[in-house]
UniProtKB/Swiss-Prot annotation:
Belongs to the FAM135 family. Residues 536-596, 629-662, 935-964 are annotated as: Disordered. Gene3D superfamilies: alpha/beta hydrolase. InterPro entries: AB_hydrolase_fold (IPR029058), DUF3657 (IPR022122), DUF676_lipase-like (IPR007751), Lipase-like (IPR044294). PANTHER family: LIPASE ROG1-RELATED-RELATED, PROTEIN FAM135A. Residues 564-580, 629-654, 950-964 have a biased composition (Polar residues). SUPFAM superfamilies: alpha/beta-Hydrolases. This is Protein FAM135A.
Length: 1506
């Protein structure tokens, strides 16, 4: 091994020292030293660049490798001292010449900064006169290409709150033969293991041994006149020369380019004099010169000379760089902003946000808390936390690491959110889904686009949906498992996780599965839903509305446009506005919808065929593309009333649809046998979404099934045509009560497939993402999480499934499905069913809506449905909900299979969309909605009109005629085809167009295309569709887009909302145009990324091969695209987002808000970013904060994000949000003295047995995070000597303290905020009720409650804590502790806490922020967050009182439009100590954990104090 000497030079500038809150006056000094691992032979030389500025108390000095800053004196609070000490550290090392670059990037360069202090006499000569009081170690991550140019504020510990700002520049400056000897550590043996470390200097090698290798020896030639050089030595010399020259030139190029960039961005910076060097040409020239030399001595000298010349050039450039930029204020400001942005972005990882309807705040939500713990466990079981890339300058004590970063969950309660898509998460089913999608993926890859081929799935007779899994589901689960095992390890992990879940949670998990394809606990959050419904959902039991079938009244309420509209409030108000428009468009649909339809929708419309089980594989032939066989397992509820309980269908009602497809030819020329058992009666309304489509022609409302022939343009659909007999749909809709099983033989041609009328029902069945049509009930109702999950999984887990079921379902079912998908989590059976749908389509609505109501709302508002012919405007539909699913965001593509009920989502989409086939896909829709009796002309115009009024002008104008569809690109067509598949429902092509707007071809989709696309996709037959499909539009249409990219899915789902919301900046047409292009990319990405989850969703790279490409072209194109994406995932923002977003970042909320997002923005914006932000602007920083990390770290992190995506976690992560709470670096602005607005007074109140310094860190991080703001803190100390008194006494003290503080300092108060810890929160609330404080009520701004026992300690689960508090109460005779237990009066309604809850207070605040932790056993979690707990529900005595207190506290808050309620759950990374065990560590972590507080405030909470 040949070693070379390298020198890396570091310039360390100590800019300023800030006294944040030092306790002692005296002399302070910063000492800096550089260390690298002892295993690398090295020497460190330190020096001061030049003395600048005042010497202060004493000047800076150098002591060997230690540099001491100026010594300065601190006398005053908030004092700033300008140091401007520039230290130069030259690190000389011996490196292996074969691994120079790798070694330099892996070395840990450790910069140690120590704070030294003395309050006595000080002599500069005596280093020991100053004592070390605090220190920080910075790990500098150096790169040869980029060097290191960074700025950081280094804060010392809690007891010495001070900050020193440090700027670091580093570059390689020399690389040559070893010129000095280096100490080498002597290996220790067991004999001298206790001896002090020893080292010996290494020998200095000769130049020849370095150039030619250590084994080189001179050999004379035969003539004795020259030396011979063996070929191996000569090759070594050439390689040595090339490697070192290339490395030096690389460092030169990096430093030169950075220098140029700095001089361009900072005009005041000195310009660069050196001419630019053509690095590659120079390297080639040097190598050619060396190869011309024959004499070994001359060769070695020439190589040495070349290296010396390059080193001199590099040193000259480095010297000029330092001269120009050292202590340059503008550059320091620029670097400080960069570091702050990266740091906040890094903190935003693992910070989750969930958005709920406002009324959900009063619902029983303990399942949410439990799901938070499960999510934490699942996240920690992945490599996400351990692979989090470090910052360029890393300090684990300040920036956090695997062992210290908390995971935070935020629950928002917004008027703009109608459906609760962020339901509790149970990992099992979501894992199953991912497995299923993997399975599908493999199969689709094998056979083509269809879905996964799985064993026949048979639906077990109706069983308690929540209690049993059908055998078919089990089989599906097994098959999925097998496939999943073949899939990514991450998915396997997920599966294991799911297996560990308890069966009883299965229902909940299934229901959850809609939004993010994460299984959501059956929890509905709809304003219309009664609290009992919420509770039932939470408990996993169907709400009464579910059991009874959706109540028409409820349905209407649920479909209330406002309710339905799930505004993307998650992200931004703008997205909300877009959603609002959407809701307005949708409202007419809801009005038309019948209760039954709503029910179906709630059930997810998957249960359309009550007992339809499709086993075997279905593939719609695509001329060009192979379609993998798919098995579909469909279970439909026996009746709309039973929708919630898909499995409730009678056992005799089981129907099996067996479709055998030729592996390559799809089903060309083959026959499929459809076996239909007796159908339970289904209410016509159930099947009909048509009522939802006001614009559609009314069909006879009789029960007779009517068929609508809808040609789906091959654009999206492929040439293949699929005809589902209207009768079959109608029968399904009408719930054919056929006791006997019937067999229908259907010839499947490449062009079309017709299914008997009796099978119509099956069309409405939902399709799982995995490509398996799963019984709606089977997934949702099945207790077996694995089965349900797998069924849901499908290729495009949640997101795709959500979209797809909506499209595939009959109109009513679709509507319900879309609605139901939202509410599936809420409704137990229905929600379960919907969950399966959602898993398929990642039903966003499921997650968001309350069980039944949510389902209804989401589906209807999104699209207008006319009879069974309803066309869903995907855009109009609650795609944002799908967005919420994020991962599967749109499986619709997959689902667009021609077969109405039996095809996989993916399979359907693929087949129907076979672009290769020019023939439009023909779908026969039965009037499944006999009740509505409205025949929706597939002209999506009606439903399109509502959603796309503005931009859709083209599509809207079109009639049901297929013409309108033609304009649609393949994407649109795909949308239509899913509709076809659904049988009665067609997705609005317009929506699809909206999403795909430009289609991959880039041509804007016409609204009419969109409109007609749903039913009549045939319009532009194949040409446009083919292009679009190739472009991935088809997938987009089906939602594969969203599947691939959560943000994409969101955008798509939201698209129609966006279009309907045209409210968005652009008309739909504009959006379509922009979105079309991006959608093309997105579609491809999505497909590639796994949005088409069946095929490639499992791919860690996030790319998914599209299996539903029309013909082979589409498949090939998609695969190519996916390959490109995978290969370019690091460079492509879209791809990366897909990867990043996939798990962690796929935020349902973002998706909801996404409606405002434009598809075009998607291509520009990271998938992650798009999702979370309902904003349409691009934002790259969500993924860019780690872009300068080493590629292996970036790759590992993206892989971990993919793992996280597989978990289908609900909500979104703040890392995907473009704008975070903090944007201004610490100390970046001076306080504005002349503000006329007055000061913002923040009163901090400590807890039991606390003192005024308890909230010192909270104060610090708010002050640092709001530079320039006029903020004044009152750290309450009046009660610190006696916190055991009763609350009335402590209230009087605090009130006096506040009023006196304002008067003494003559403050002009513009805002008053309160921050309380523990007991202090009750004192604050009590102050608000006092007459003397009435004057200040109008100035109240934010109430931040940190672990406050607002409901007392009545239901504390810790016996140890209860015993301790009881003892303390008796010992101290504490009135406050007695009042906390609600035992201070014999009548519970006369206790202090109950009376306090009846008094006005909280609703006066603009923000009510409740922070709690499940790890905190001092204060019950539900008491800190003011929510119902399970124990209180069971307590017949005090439980009612507890519930009344919650309503008394929150009802005024919820009714006040100007009051924002937010709850947080903090999962701290706590060590295994006694404090952690008894729950004390978490209780005080909200006060003394720097990393938690900084993460909490920088990412989210600072906005409450701005």
């Amino acid at each position: 091994m040949t070693e070379v000497q390298a020198m890396v030079e570091f310039s360390v500038e100590l800019n300023k020292f800030y006294n944040v809150d030092l306790f002692q006056r005296g002399f302070y000094q910063i000492r800096a030293s550089m260390k690298i691992p002892a295993r690398i032979p090295h020497r460190v030389e330190a020096s001061l660049l030049h003395a600048t500025g005042m010497t202060l108390a004493f000047p800076a000095s150098v002591h060997d490798a230690l540099v001491c800053s100026k010594t300065f004196q601190i006398l005053y609070k908030n004092e700033e001292v300008v140091l401007n000490d520039v230290m130069i550290f030259k690190v000389k090392m011996l490196l292996d010449e074969r691994k120079i670059e790798e070694t330099l990037e892996e070395i840990s360069f450790l910069l140690s900064l120590g704070l030294h202090f003395t309050d006595g006499d000080y002599s500069a000569d005596d280093l020991n006169a100053l004592q070390l009081i605090s220190s920080r170690t910075l790990k500098l991550h150096y790169s040869i290409c980029r060097g290191l140019h960074h700025h950081a504020n280094v804060m010392f510990d809690y007891f010495h709150l001070s900050v020193v700002s440090v700027t670091v520049h580093a570059s390689l400056v020399a690389l040559h033969q070893p010129l000095i000897s280096f100490p080498r550590p002597v290996k220790t043996t067991w004999l001298n293991r206790n001896a002090p470390a020893q080292s010996k200097d290494s020998a200095i090698p000769t130049l020849e041994s370095v150039v030619f290798g250590i084994n080189y020896t001179k050999q004379l030639s035969p003539d004795g006149c020259s030396f011979l050089i063996a070929e191996s030595f000569l090759h070594h010399a050439y390689h040595f020369h090339y490697t070192l020259c290339a490395t030096l030139l690389l460092a030169f190029k990096g430093l030169h380019s950075y220098f140029i960039t700095v001089t361009e961005e900072i005009p005041s910076c000195q310009k660069l004099d050196l001419e630019e060097m053509d690095v590659e040409a120079r390297l080639t020239e040097l190598c050619e010169e060396v190869k011309k030399v024959e004499n070994p001595d001359e060769l070695a000298e020439l190589i040495n000379m070349n290296l010396a010349q390059l080193c001199s050039l590099l040193m000259a450039l480095w010297g000029q760089f330092l001269e120009a930029i050292t202590l340059h204020e503008d550059l320091r400001v620029l670097l400080a902003q960069e570091h702050h942005t990266l740091r906040v972005r890094r903190f935003s990882e693992a910070f989750f946000c969930f958005e709920h309807p406002r009324e959900a705040a009063i619902a029983y939500q303990e399942l949410h808390a439990q799901s938070h713990l499960q999510m934490c466990t699942a996240i920690k079981n992945t490599s996400f936390c351990s692979s989090l890339p470090p910052l360029p300058i890393e300090c684990s004590e300040l920036d956090g690491d695997l062992n210290s970063l908390p995971i935070i969950f935020e629950d928002r309660y917004l008027d703009s959110v109608i459906e609760d898509l962020d339901a509790p998460w149970m990992g099992i089913q979501s894992l199953q889904i991912s497995e299923a999608s993997k399975t599908d993926k493999h199969e689709t890859e094998e056979s083509s686009v269809v879905g996964l081929s799985s064993p026949e799935l048979k639906v077990r007779p109706a069983v308690a949906s929540s209690n049993c899994y059908t055998e078919g589901e089990k089989q599906l689960t097994k098959s999925l498992k097998g496939k999943n095992e073949e899939s990514n390890k991450s998915k396997v992990k997920v599966t294991k996780l799911m297996k560990t879940m308890k069966p009883e949670n299965t229902k909940k998990l299934i229901k959850q599965n809609s939004k993010d394809s994460v299984v959501l606990v059956s929890y509905k959050c709809l304003k219309t839903t009664a609290s009992s419904d919420f509770t039932k959902c939470l408990e996993g039991s169907p709400s009464h509305s579910q059991k009874e079938g959706l109540d028409p009244t409820l349905c209407a309420g649920n479909f209330d446009p406002k309710t339905y509209t799930r505004q993307p409030s998650q992200k931004e108000a703008s997205s909300l506005s877009a959603n609002t428009d959407r809701s307005e468009h949708k409202s007419p649909d809801t009005e038309n919808m019948q209760p039954d339809q709503f029910e179906l929708l709630n059930s997810g419309s998957l249960n359309l065929c009550a007992n339809l089980s499709i086993s075997g594989k279905l593939a719609i032939s695509q001329d060009n593309s192979d379609i993998p066989d798919t098995e579909h397992n469909l279970a439909s509820t026996s009746s709309s009333n039973d929708c919630h309980d898909y499995q409730t269908t009678p056992s005799s009602g089981v129907r099996t649809l067996e479709v055998k497809s030729s592996s390559k030819e799809s089903f060309n020329g083959e026959k499929i046998t459809v076996k239909i058992g007796p159908w339970t009666e289904l209410q016509e309304a159930e099947l009909f979404v048509d009522n939802l489509l006001p614009d559609f022609e009314a069909l006879d409302s009789n029960d007779k099934p009517k068929s609508i022939d809808i040609p789906l343009e091959r654009d999206a659909l492929q040439e293949t045509k699929c005809h589902s007999t209207e009768e079959s749909l109608t029968k399904f809709r009408s719930n054919l009560p056929a006791p006997s099983t019937k067999e229908y033989h259907v010839a499947v041609s490449s062009d079309t497939i017709k299914l008997p009328d009796t099978n119509a029902t099956y069309a409405s069945s939902r399709f799982s993402d995995s490509g398996v049509e799963s019984e709606p009930s089977s997934f949702a109702t099945h207790p077996n999480p694995e089965i349900a999950f797998e069924t849901l999984q499908g290729p495009g887990p949640c997101n795709n499934e959500r979209l797809f079921p909506q499209l595939l379902m009959k109109p009513d079912h679709n509507v319900k499905f879309s609605l139901g998908s939202h509410c599936t989590e809420s409704t137990s059976a229905l929600s379960e069913i919907q969950s399966s749908l959602t898993s398929i389509n990642s039903l966003p609505s499921d997650d968001e809506l309350s069980p039944d109501d949510n389902c209804k709302k989401s589906a209807v508002p999104d699209c207008h449905l006319s009879d069974s012919k309803t066309v869903f405007n995907l855009g109009t539909m609650d795609l944002p909900k799908c967005d919420d699913t994020k991962k599967s965001s749109i499986i619709l593509q997959q689902q667009s299979v021609v077969f109405s009920g039996h095809l996989d989502n993916d399979t359907l989409a693929m087949h129907s969309l076979d672009l290769s086939t020019e023939d439009p896909l023909r779908l026969v829709f039965l009037d499944e909605d006999a009740s509505s009796g409205v025949r929706s002309s597939w002209g999506s115009k009606p439903h399109l009109d509502a959603p796309f009024t503005g931009p859709q002008s083209q599509g809207t104008s079109s009639n049901n005629s297929t013409e309108s569809v033609p304009t649609l690109n393949s994407k649109l067509i795909c949308l239509g085809s899913p509709c076809v598949v659904s049988g009665s429902v067609c997705t609005d092509a317009g929506l699809s167009a909206d999403r795909t707007v430009e289609g991959k071809s880039g041509e804007p989709l016409n609204h009419k295309q969109v409109c007609s696309a749903a039913p009549v996709v045939e319009s532009d037959p194949l040409s446009s569709s083919t292009d679009v499909v190739k472009q991935g539009l088809v997938e987009n249409y089906f939602g594969s887009q969203s599947t691939t990219d959560v943000s994409d899915a969101c955008a798509i789902t939201c698209h129609s909302p966006v279009s309907s919301q045209e409210t968005c900046d652009k008309g739909i047409s504009d959006l379509q145009q922009e979105q079309g292009k991006e959608e093309e990319e997105e579609d491809q990405e999505m497909v590639q990324n796994g949005y088409h989850e069946e095929t490639d969703f499992s791919a860690t790279d996030g790319t998914v091969s599209v299996h539903y490409i029309s013909g082979n072209e589409l498949g090939e194109g998609r695969h190519e695209q996916s390959e490109k994406l995978s290969s370019n995932y690091l460079s492509a923002g879209v791809t990366v987002p897909a990867v990043c977003t996939s798990g962690c970042l796929s935020f349902p909320s973002a998706l909801r808000e996404s409606p405002c997002v434009k598809y075009s923005s998607r291509s520009k914006v990271d998938a992650i970013t798009k999702q979370p932000s309902s904003i349409s602007y691009n934002f790259s920083s969500s993924t860019s904060w780690y872009e300068n990390s080493p590629k292996p770290q970036i790759h590992a992190f993206l892989q971990a994000k993919e793992e996280l995506k597989q978990l289908r976690l609900p909500g979104f992560m703040y890392s995907d949000v473009p704008l975070l709470a903090s944007s201004a670096p610490y100390f970046s602005m001076d306080e504005e003295d002349g503000s006329e607005d007055g000061v913002h007074l923040i009163v901090c109140v400590h807890g039991l047995d606390g003192n005024s310094a308890d909230l010192r860190l909270v104060k610090t991080y708010i002050e640092l995070g709001l530079p320039g703001g006029r903020v004044d803190f009152l750290m309450s100390e009046r009660n610190q000597n006696d916190t055991f008194a009763d609350f009335d006494c402590m209230t009087d003290r605090l009130l006096d303290e506040i009023i006196q503080y304002i008067q003494i300092y003559s403050l002009t108060v513009s805002k008053i905020s309160f921050i309380g810890h523990s007991l202090g929160n009750l004192i604050i609330r009590s102050v608000l009720t006092r007459p003397r404080f009435k004057y200040y009520l109008s100035k109240l701004h934010t109430f931040l409650s940190l672990s406050g026992p607002h409901l007392g300690t009545l239901y504390n689960s810790s016996a140890l804590v209860n015993t301790g508090l009881w003892f303390m109460q008796k010992w101290k005779k504490s009135g406050s502790l007695l009042q906390l237990t609600c035992r201070d009066h014999s009548d519970p309604r006369q206790t202090f806490l109950y009376k306090l809850s009846n008094k006005a207070g909280l609703h006066y605040f603009k923000n009510v922020v409740l922070v709690g932790s499940l790890q905190d056993r001092y204060v019950p979690y539900h008491s800190a967050r003011i929510e119902m707990c399970k124990t209180a529900l069971k307590d017949k005595q005090s439980g009612q009182i507890y519930s009344e207190m919650i309503h008394n506290l929150l009802r005024p808050v919820l009714q006040s439009k100007g009051c924002n309620l937010v709850r947080y759950n903090v999962i701290n990374a706590l060590p295994n100590t006694a404090d952690s065990l008894i729950g004390r560590a978490a209780h005080i972590a909200v006060l003394d954990s720097e990393i938690f507080l900084e993460k909490f405030f920088l990412v989210a909470a600072l906005k409450y104090f701005q």
